Amino acid sequence: MHYSQTSSFGGNHTEIAKIIHKFLQPRVKQYPLWNPPSREYMSRAMACQICEVTINEMDTLLICDACEKAYHLKCLQGNNMKGVPKSEWHCSRCVQAFNGKPFPPTYGRATRAVATTTAKMPFRAAGVLSSSAKKIGPMDIKANQQKPIVSTFSRLQNTGLVSGAATTSQFESASVNAKTTASAAKTTNIGSQGSKENVACGANSPAPVSLTETPNRTGIASTISVINNGLISKPLTPVGTMSSTSPLPVVNQLPVNATSNASPSTPITASLVAQAPTVTQNGDGSSTASGTADHSILNADITTQVHTLTVTSSSNSQQAVSHSEVAKATEDAAPLENVSECEKPSESTSHPDSLNDKTISENVQESSKDAKVDSEACQNHPTASPATVVPDQDSTITAAPSVTQEDSAFNTEKTPPQPLSVSSNYDSQTEKETPNVQDSVHNVPGDSEKGKGLNGLDDRHQEQPSEPEFYKSDSVKEENAA
C-alpha cells in the first residue's frame, strides 16, 4: 500500500514551509496604526469620539478612513470644520500620526468611491448632456437664422430680376405668316415716345412678323423695315404730311417728308407700308393715337402716290396680311367739310374689277387727270390749310378697306414693265396750269447724290406757309410725271 508515501510527502511540505519562514526576514510595518478593515460599525452602534454619545442617525455620522472611528458632524463643525469633505476624510489624530505621509488604503474607500461615482455619474452625464445641448442649441439657432437669410436673399434676387425686367422693357410678340414680294423702308420720329417695329417678309415664303415695344423716356425712332428676297424695288413715300387721327385728342403730329429715287424706266413693284395705331400718354393725362398707311404703286410715274391707288393683282397671290386696323384708324377720322367736298373717292380710287381691263399707261393717264381735277376743285377753297388736308389724304388712300395685300402684289410674270407713254397734250396742259413747277421741282430732292434731303421741303413749307399743301404735292407729282 502507498499510504506511507503520502504521509511522508505531507510531512515534508510542512517542514519545507518552516525552513523557508526561518530564512525569510520579517518586514517592517509601513503603517504602524493601520488595522485591517472591519464592518463593526455596520452591525453595532458607534459612539462619537468627541462627545462620546451613541450615533443613531446615519445622516450625522462621519467615519475616519484610516482608524474607522465615528464622529458627529455637529461636533466636527464646532472644531472649525466647514463641511463634509468630498474625498477621503481623516481625523485629526490620524493626520498627526502620519505626519504628512500617505494614508494606507482602506476598505471603505473603494465602497465609498463606487457610491460617489454612482452618485456623481448622473450629475456628470447630465452636465455633459447639458453642455452638448448648449453646443447643439446655438448651432440649431444659427442654422435656423441662416435659413431665413438664404431664403430672403433668393427672394430679393428674384424680385429684383422681375422688377428690373418689368421696368426695363415690355415685349409683345405676334407671329404672322405673310407671302409678299413688296419691300419698303420708312423712318419717322414720334414726339417724346415711340415704338420700334421690325417686320420681316420673305418672297413667296411664310415668315414670322414680330412686334417689339420698348418704352423709353426719350424719343425713339419708329422704324418699319421690310426685307426683300432678290426683287428690284425701292422705298416710296409721298411728299407731304400724312397722318390719321382718332376721336382721341391729337397732340403730336407725324410729319413724313421723303422723295423717290426711282427712274421711270425701272420696274418697281407695289410697296406697302403699314403701321398699327399707337397710343401714347402725355404728362397731362391726354393720349394721342396715330396710324399711318401708304398704298402706292409706281410704274415709271409718281403722280399716283397721294390721290390714287392703282393695284395690279394676280390670281396666284394669296391673302396674308389684313389692314383692318389701318382702315379702322382712318375711317374713324373726322375730315373737315371743305376737304370732303374737294375729294372724290370714286374718281381717285380705282376698283379691282377695272385693273385687268386697263393697261399700265391708261391707268397712269386717268390717275393724272383725276389728280388734276382734284387740284382744280380744291383751288376754289382758299380757306383750306395744310393741316386740314392731312386726314383727308389718309381717308382717300384707305377709302377701299377691302383692298388687301393680295391686291397690292404686283404680278411681274404676267405683266412685264412697259415705259410710260404720256401724250403731248397732257404736257402742254400741265405747263399752262402749273407755272411754278420748275421752282417746286428744284426744291425736291430727286437724287441722293446731290445731298438734298428733307430739309429742302421743310424750308419750302416755312417760306410759304399760306400756300396749300396739296397744291404743292400735285405740282411735284406732275413734274415727275413729265
UniProtKB/Swiss-Prot annotation:
InterPro entries: Zinc_finger_PHD-type_CS (IPR019786), Znf_FYVE_PHD (IPR011011), Znf_PHD (IPR001965), Znf_PHD-finger (IPR019787), Znf_RING/FYVE/PHD (IPR013083). GO terms for molecular function: zinc ion binding. Keywords: Metal-binding, Zinc, Zinc-finger. Residues 314-324 have a biased composition (Low complexity). Residues 377-386, 393-428 have a biased composition (Polar residues). Residues 188-210, 314-482 are annotated as: Disordered. Residues 447-482 have a biased composition (Basic and acidic residues). SUPFAM superfamilies: FYVE/PHD zinc finger. A zinc finger (PHD-type) spans 45-97. Pfam families: PHD (PF00628). This is PHD finger protein At3g20280. It comes from Arabidopsis thaliana (Mouse-ear cress). The lineage of its organism: Eukaryota, Viridiplantae, Streptophyta, Embryophyta, Tracheophyta.
